[in-house]
Design a protein with these regions (language model features):
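Eukaryotic low-complexity, non-globular regulatory regions
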Residues: 2-9
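Short, mixed-charge, low-aromatic patches
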Residues: 13, 26-30, 65-73
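Negatively charged, low-complexity tracts enriched in Asp/Glu with abundant Ser/Thr
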Residues: 14-58
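Short histidine-centered catalytic/ligand-binding loop motif
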Residues: 18-26, 94-105
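Amphipathic, interaction-prone secondary-structure segments
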Residues: 50-81
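Intrinsically disordered, low-complexity regulatory segments enriched in Ser/Thr/Pro
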Residues: 76-103
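Well-ordered alpha/beta subsegment
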Residues: 101-122
Length: 122
């Protein structure tokens, strides 16, 4: 069972989840989308929060390091990799040469897609 913040519906995903579970999580807040934060070092992600910042804080409280965390939006009705949208305020970090809400470094985007691809059942 994933670690979970009951108050904010945030859970840490370390084992593959189904698209059905993502769709159910989406319905709780946004309808068609799930916010997620990926930890590139631990190869896990947090989902289910209303804000990427809440998921980021949850992961950091569980030992993640901020520089390894990247925010995405997941649209479970789309196919992979189109279901991933790189758009989050937590991604703005000039010290890592990322000056927008997107993920500007192509290698970092590929790593994020790899982690997400491994954590979502096809």
């Amino acid at each position: 069972m994933p670690e979970m913040d009951i108050e904010n519906n945030i859970k840490i995903i370390s084992q593959p989840v189904s698209l059905l579970e993502l769709k159910q999580t989406a319905k709780l807040i946004f309808g068609d989308m799930v916010k997620g934060v990926v930890d590139l070092e631990k190869k896990i992600m947090a989902i289910g929060g209303e804000l990427h910042a809440d998921e980021e804080a949850f992961l950091m409280n569980h030992g993640s390091i901020q520089q390894n965390l990247w925010g995405v939006n997941l649209y479970p009705d789309r196919t992979f990799p189109e279901l991933v949208e790189f758009d989050s305020m937590i991604n703005i970090r000039p010290r890592q040469n990322n000056r927008s809400r997107s993920v500007e470094d192509e290698n970092t985007r590929k790593l994020i897609l790899k982690v997400i691809g491994d954590l979502i059942e096809k």
